[in-house]
């Protein structure tokens, strides 16, 4: 039985499209713990919109400017502008690759952001976010969910984030 809410999503060019939801997690750089997560329908802008939603809530809670490290899929002018509008400094990897038409893409992140030491630190910590998803697929229940409906899948996803944090905390205490 397939989930009627799922959408077809392709992870990369040349790959097959699969029915799925998209899980999004926010990780803090200092300890590597997941601090926010949500599940959305798979769309072309779901990652960026989820990022903006989670970061807006984080800024509101903290009451100060924060920085965020993101991969080059987030390097769009509208996303960078939206982040700056909600008091977030985007440390997004620059997407200046060459398109299929042979043109070089223009990054929305300029030298004013990339010259700071914090930018390189955010970029090195960014890779650790993938550990959350890797752990959830290998040890948790994120590889193939048995739940139907976005609410049930979201609960399962958040449970995996909590479990990841519980596994991670003893390693932090020992260090």
Locate each region found by the language model.
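Helix-centered, glycine/charged polyanion-binding patches within enzymatic domains
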Residues: 72-155
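A generic membrane alpha-helix/interface feature
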Residues: 46-49, 54, 89, 105, ...
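Polybasic low-complexity intrinsically disordered regions
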Residues: 1-86, 95, 156-159, 164, ...
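A short, flexible helix-boundary coil/loop motif
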Residues: 139, 143, 170-175
């Amino acid at each position: 039985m397939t989930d009627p809410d799922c959408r077809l999503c392709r992870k990369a060019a040349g790959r097959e499209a699969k029915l799925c939801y998209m899980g999004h997690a926010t990780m803090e750089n200092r300890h590597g713990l997941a601090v926010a997560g949500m599940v959305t329908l798979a769309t072309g802008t779901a990652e960026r919109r989820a990022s903006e939603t989670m970061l807006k809530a984080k800024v509101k809670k903290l009451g100060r400017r924060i920085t965020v490290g993101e991969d080059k899929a987030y390097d769009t002018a509208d996303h960078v502008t939206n982040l700056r509008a909600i008091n977030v400094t985007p440390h997004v990897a620059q997407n200046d690759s060459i398109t299929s038409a042979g043109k070089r893409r223009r990054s929305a992140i300029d030298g004013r952001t990339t010259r700071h030491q914090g930018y390189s630190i955010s970029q090195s910590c960014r890779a650790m976010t993938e550990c959350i998803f890797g752990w959830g697929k290998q040890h948790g229940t994120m590889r193939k969910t048995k739940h139907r409906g976005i609410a049930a899948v979201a609960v399962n996803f958040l449970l995996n984030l909590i479990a990841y944090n519980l596994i991670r905390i003893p390693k932090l205490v020992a260090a």
